UniProtKB/Swiss-Prot annotation:
It comes from Xenopus laevis (African clawed frog). Gene3D superfamilies: P-loop containing nucleotide triphosphate hydrolases. It is an enzyme of class 3 (hydrolase). CDD domains: RalA_RalB. It catalyses: GTP + H2O = GDP + phosphate + H(+). This is Ras-related protein ralB-B.
């Protein structure tokens, strides 16, 4: 029975999501809230923690693999390896800390550098801790403007109240799915083109 369950899960489409952002912005809290419906305020930072969950995305069962990376500068050198494996990115900052918002530009540059061969990288900018409106340092218009400049979606979340937590993960998975479908279509088109070309050449030889 267990073997069948593993087989079924392994046949599901897997979307790989990377959590990116400065330390203390709530990346782990967002991840744990999405995974387990729990709010964890104090979390010890590590190099990276990986989570996997089966979800229903627009009527289809899929798996999401979430890699929660550390924001500390000490781990900057190993981030490249994590970024290479990612298919979509949640770029998180805290609305109560403007420095963490400023840092998103550097994180984005690192992602673009590592994924330079890819055309459009699925990425969402996430302003976390929206429940702390009285401590806001990053105006919503400023954050939204930066996201528009980058051509990506901006969403404000609260890991504490669970506001928009599911939304950011599901919206990102949709972008990842769209990119995969587009890439598969391109690959199939190229294969079809090669087949037609080969057939035409063989016809000429006959």
């Amino acid at each position: 029975m267990a073997a069948n369950k593993n087989k079924n899960q392994s046949s599901l489409v897997l979307h790989k999501v990377i959590m990116v952002g400065s330390g203390g912005v709530g990346k782990s809290a967002l991840t744990l809230q999405f995974m387990y419906d729990e709010f964890v305020e104090d979390y010890e930072p590590t190099k990276a923690d990986s989570y996997r969950k089966k979800v229903v995305l627009d009527g289809e069962e899929v798996q999401i693999d979430i890699l929660d990376t550390a924001g500390q500068e000490d781990y900057a050198a190993i981030r490249d390896n994590y970024f290479r494996s990612g298919e979509g990115f949640l770029l998180v900052f805290s609305i109560t800390e403007h420095e963490s918002f400023t840092a998103t530009a550097e994180f984005r540059e690192q992602i673009l550098r590592v994924k330079a061969e890819e055309d459009k990288i699925p990425l969402l900018v996430v302003g976390n801790k929206s429940d702390l409106e009285d401590r806001r340092q990053v105006p919503m218009d400023e954050a939204r403007g930066k996201a528009e400049e980058w051509g990506v979606q901006y969403v404000e979340t609260s890991a504490k109240t669970r506001a928009n937590v599911d939304k950011v993960f599901f919206d990102l998975m949709r972008e990842v799915r769209t990119k995969k479908m587009s890439e598969n279509k391109d690959k199939n088109g190229k294969k079809s083109g090669k087949s037609k070309k080969g057939f035409k050449q063989r016809c000429c030889l006959l």
